[in-house]
Amino acid sequence: MGSNKCTLDFYDYRTGLYSRNFYAERNPNVIKELGDVGNDIGIYGSKLYVVVNCSHKVEVMDAKTGIRLGQIDIPNCRYVRFYRGRAYVSSYVGPVLIDPDAPKGAVFEVDTTSFAITRKVSVGYQPEEMEIVDDYMYVANSGGYRVPDYDNTVSVIQMIDFKQVQQIPVGINLHRVKKDRYNKLWVTSRGDYQTRPSRLYVLDKRKGYNQMIVTDTIPVACSNMAIKGDSLFYYATEWNNYTSSNTISYGIIDVRSKEIISKSFITDGTEKDITIPYGIAVHPETGDIFVTDAKNYVSSGTLYCFTKDGRKKWSVRTGDIPAHIVFLPN
């Protein structure tokens, strides 16, 4: 943070070539390049969106060429999702600092043609990831700036009116939210890094009702996850303030049975080469599993590619703290 070291890399599946700092190469006249702290990435239509948290903006570029098209100014922006011609960006709203009086966060609606902000709705404290199911958006609120008074809710936004209609109590310090192909939501809690551990929660609709409720608590730590078919691949880098150390784990959960079916998706022992897992994605066609390694947080990281059976295929040096992956459709 504070060093404008956000970069964009590009891997070409056809040639096997990996290009570091792709954005700077394609946009040599952009001052300070991408900016400070890249926090999310997404593709919608022909455009690529990069959420740059501490530069308070979303950079927009052509998804195939990487040429810059413009930017959207949003304070302390976090994550981006897309729906019916609009981009939705979660925002902490307030400045980047721990503050027990930090304001509630918001979700901004952006026109993907003009890049104009069209609507805004207030949600919980320090909102993170979002998902949309049946014309409702679900937003994980962390309250991370208000430690130890974390938020514990998922905000529900009705997309037609763009109003918050409910807050679902789930767990403290929420972060990730992903939907599976059965429209269940998988939500992570980071816990309090002391006595309350990270957990994974399942939200589903009650029979005959249109409201989501917490149906299951999966007793695993989960920092991030990727879902393909009926398999949820996850890793955990669980920090403990008492021991000043991380506990790292990997696994696979069957989203239908909600059972842990494997304690690691890496099967050849090469997980020992990963220092700090920091991002995960599964290729939608090949099933290849990608894991990023942040290493020491200050120098180049590594991107690992594993087969769908968990065997290492290759690895490559990346920019600093690699974290977010998106696949460009053919």
Could you tell me what each predicted segment is?
Residues 1-330:
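Predominantly soluble domains enriched in secretory-pathway, periplasmic, or organellar proteins
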